[in-house]
Regions:
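Residues immediately within or flanking Cys/His clusters that coordinate Zn2+
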Residues: 161
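Soluble non-cytosolic domains of exported or imported proteins
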Residues: 167-170
Length: 182
């Protein structure tokens, strides 16, 4: 877990941040989830769970709640050096993608939050294991950018992400899925 990023996420006023960006913030209805991925801006080196996924919602008692999960919002070294697509590895472009995901199955194996509508990705195809966020490579479409789990307690991204948003451990993922089912 990136403790500095975790601490910043713990103190952030996401409703204000999202509204200031012109995004929607869901503050009505119970368990109307705001799922927010925060990318570590410290470096562009691959293979660490150094990002966080924040989930904010109103719980069953009407109380605003927040969970913060260790995650990666970027591909692992395996996909960066050997991209699945000839166009290069997909890296989700920051932005709000409302209703772009739904409950489904990740690679047909287990329930996850799966891409349902188009999103934008950068394409990184130089196979150097350093993220390139080049606006000239942006592509929009459905690429299977899912929100899923890594191993039980993974410390390296490796093969867990080819562009997906991946929670580092199973317990956090189970919590996210319980929230998504409410």
């Amino acid at each position: 877990m990136n403790k500095e990023l975790f601490n910043k996420a713990s103190k952030a006023d996401f409703s204000k941040i999202l509204i200031n960006k012109g995004y929607a913030y869901f503050n009505k209805g119970k368990y109307n989830l705001n799922i927010i991925g925060i990318r570590n801006a410290g470096n562009n080196v691959t293979n660490k769970f150094d990002d966080v996924i924040v989930v904010e919602y109103i719980d069953m008692y009407g109380i605003k709640s927040r969970n913060i999960f260790a995650a990666t919002t970027e591909p692992g070294i395996t996909s960066m050096t050997k991209p699945v697509s000839y166009k290069g590895c997909a890296i989700l472009v920051p932005g709000q993608y409302r209703s772009a995901w739904k409950l489904g199955y990740h690679k047909g194996k287990y329930e996850a939050i799966v891409q349902y509508k188009p999103v934008k990705v950068y394409r990184d195809n130089n196979k150097d294991a350093i993220y390139d966020f080049n606006p000239k490579t942006i592509e929009e479409g459905t690429f299977g950018i899912n929100i899923h789990k890594a191993g039980t307690h993974s410390t390296q991204v490796n093969n867990w992400s080819a562009g997906c948003q991946v929670l580092a451990n199973k317990e956090d993922f189970d919590t996210l899925m319980k929230l998504a089912h409410r």
